[in-house]
Amino acid sequence: YKMNKYNTNHTFAVCAYKESPYLEECIRSLKAQTVQTNIGIYTSTPNDHIQSIADRYDVPVYVNPDAGKGIQADWNFAYNSADTDYVTVAHQDDTYEPGYVETLLSSVKRYEDWSMYYTDYTPIKDGDSSRRDVNSRIRRFLRWPVKNTAKADSIRRKKLSLCMGNTIVCPLVTYNKGRLGDTVFTSEYNFNLDWDTFYKLAC
């Protein structure tokens, strides 16, 4: 496989575990992007299920040679292995709207010093993603400090948007690896390590 088929400077690094029934739907949503981009599957649990889906959609699979060290190590393996400046660490049970990459590439052109890009989300329930649940509403409300784009680069505002909990959904984040370097996940936590990462980046 040639890792970078597209010159978007972006990769969807899909973290796959065991035999998820949602992995194929996730990959389909990435293949359906209005701007085609690079996709790779990264796993510590290689199996026929993952490989068959990868073969079906012509997506390369990368196996973590240092498996068994936890989710943070798996995320860093996927992030570090992606050979582009922009990396979205996608989770196997999430899907993306077709315009995610197009909007990303358009948005980041306006900011030379960006480190992290993220979007809103809605949960999928019984195949329906048109309705917000309570968690989605609360998270959206708590992000109010950074809704004013003219002031969103304020450290105080970024920290304020995270001080009541994790208001950002991890799979919808794209990291500017060209700015952040390797191994972006350095949390000492076993849980909420994504929130800890976002808070560190906010500082």
Model-derived features with residue positions:
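A conserved acidic beta->alpha catalytic loop
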Residues: 42-51
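Conserved donor NDP-sugar-binding/catalytic core segment of glycosyltransferases
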Residues: 99-138
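Conserved nucleotide-sugar donor-binding catalytic segment
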Residues: 145-203
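Glycine-rich, basic loop-to-helix element that forms the pyrophosphate-binding segment
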Residues: 65-82
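The conserved acidic donor/metal-binding loop of glycosyltransferases
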Residues: 91-95, 120
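N-proximal low-complexity "stem/linker" segments adjacent to membrane-targeting elements
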Residues: 1-29
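Short, acidic, metal-binding catalytic loop of nucleotide-sugar glycosyltransferases
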Residues: 28-37
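Short aromatic/hydrophobic "clamp" motif used to bind/position activated sugar donors
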Residues: 87
